[in-house]
Amino acid sequence: MRIVFAGTPEFAVSSLRAAARHHEVVAVYTQPDRPAGRGRGLAPSPVKLEAVARGIPVYQPESLKDAAAQQQLRDLQPDLMVVVAYGLILPKAVLAIPTHGCWNVHASLLPRWRGAAPIQRAIQAGDAKTGVCLMQMEAGLDTGPVLLHQELPIASTDTGGQLHDKLAELGAQVLSDGLGLLRAGIKPIARPQPEQGVTYAHKLDKAEARLDWAQDADALARTVRAFNPWPIAEATLAGERVRIHGAVALEADHGQAPGTVLAAGRDGIDIACGQGALRLRVLQREGGKAITAADYLNARRDLRVGA
């Protein structure tokens, strides 16, 4: 079976490996090299690096909307196109090129969290579980029928990065299962998504990372987890702007104004919130690296309870 794989970030690498394990991946599509790092030199995507290491031809069109790019894909004579976090829109004409259409690995239990940031939004919302769907693509945004799915519980300590890694591996497994069925001559049953329960996982914005102490501590703790490793939550702590890499919510009937330091010790720095308190455990000062609350307190001798 001739497979064309389309993906860009690290999340897609596990799925590329799964596709290449027992099938012929005739080409990989990924986004063009982008400026990265302090030197802002052009850097290849993680998927491109994996494809090059495997000797798979790589294509990097700016768009798949023009006729030349579509003909290039058509010339590959794909039986199936697998799309995982590619980042480019696939027009209807592209969806119709492969014999079996285009499959997408999506990191949520559709129709919940359609869109760009399903992993982080699931944590932010306090969802007890998430998962991966293998979807038959159509023109709408993540609206296609689901071929296979697998659930995954969200641990109370999961960060966005940790859940990302779990779902990347789960996505590869679900894709492998689907490809195995197709190779055996069994096309998975396409089940339309329910009309109820649709939510959208909008792209992360750095402005969202700014914590408001007037909010509920549980919600703030979830944001800290969801936004680690990017964009990392930030807040003002006793007059200083800090980034918060790790925090937990506490039940506290404090009666203090939001943002007040309630306690400070080796276990963390407790901050009054609109409801409850947030214990800051890992922080980062501007220009510095992430450090424990104990090390932060050693550096900020001026920090006082009640500030």
From Swiss-Prot:
It holds the Pfam family Formyl_trans_N. The keyword Protein biosynthesis applies. Keywords: Protein biosynthesis, Transferase. (6S)-5,6,7,8-tetrahydrofolate binds at residues 108-111. GO terms for cellular component: cytosol. It catalyses: L-methionyl-tRNA(fMet) + (6R)-10-formyltetrahydrofolate = N-formyl-L-methionyl-tRNA(fMet) + (6S)-5,6,7,8-tetrahydrofolate + H(+). Attaches a formyl group to the free amino group of methionyl-tRNA(fMet). The formyl group appears to play a dual role in the initiator identity of N-formylmethionyl-tRNA by promoting its recognition by IF2 and preventing the misappropriation of this tRNA by the elongation apparatus. PANTHER family: METHIONYL-TRNA FORMYLTRANSFERASE (PTHR11138), METHIONYL-TRNA FORMYLTRANSFERASE, MITOCHONDRIAL (PTHR11138:SF5). This is Methionyl-tRNA formyltransferase.
